[in-house]
Amino acid sequence: WELQPGAKPPYGNWSVETREEFAHAATARMGCVRQACETGKYNAAILLGGGEPGFLESREIGREFGVVVTANAFSQMYLATMLGDSFSIIDIEGVHNVFYRDLIRTHQLQHRCRSIRSIGYSLPRPGDTDPDTLTVQCEAVAKGDQNIVVERAVDQAEAAIVEDGAEVITLGCSMTFFLQPHIEKGLRDRGWDVPVLEGYTASIELAK
């Protein structure tokens, strides 16, 4: 495996969230995919990022070279359908939920998705002044500190099971992927033996 650093985003140095930013990211990464395929060194390419900008286009490029292309949302959803009859998504708040809803429809899995639930945090944006960001919460979790985002994520995952009928939990934005082991443990502690997926591992496994 090799990690390609990707192209510098033309809109600025922050995470994609709006449709315009997703379009810029899609265009930039298609060039990276074609370049990787043309080397002849790889038999698979994995697109990182929960919103998977440019996935369908990159998959089309990959077919020209016999290279498998996987992405985080697609991989989680289809593995989820192998593990249960239905799944729910734990995501950040805001417009990303709407974009992710459209991904579910694109992949024709709206009949298997029970809900998209929010943890109440959005991605850091230019001009944000709130000191309590998802990045801060992620760093706190890494240090082993007790924090609200893990509790919220476990609560939403349990609600997806109890109220929505989900049999598998998946994660939306890649900024939430760090929550996977904490959600899995939190659900187990509450008596739920339910698979919890995250995009990076799912994409690698599907590529294999």
Regions inferred by a protein language model and the residue ranges of each:
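Active-site rim beta-loop-alpha module in soluble metabolic enzymes
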Residues: E93, R101-G172
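Short, acidic/small-residue loops that bind anionic groups at enzyme active sites
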Residues: L56-L83, I183-A207
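Glycine-rich beta-alpha junction loops
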Residues: P5-A7, E93-H96, S118-L123, C173-F177, ...
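Glycine/small-residue-rich hydrophobic helix-like segments
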Residues: E151-V196, Y200
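N-terminal beta-loop-helix "entrance" segment that forms/cooperates
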Residues: E2-T27, G127
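N-terminal glycine-rich phosphate/adenylate-binding segment common to multiple enzyme folds
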Residues: A23-G62, V69-A73, E167-Q180
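Structural beta-sheet core signal
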Residues: S88-D91
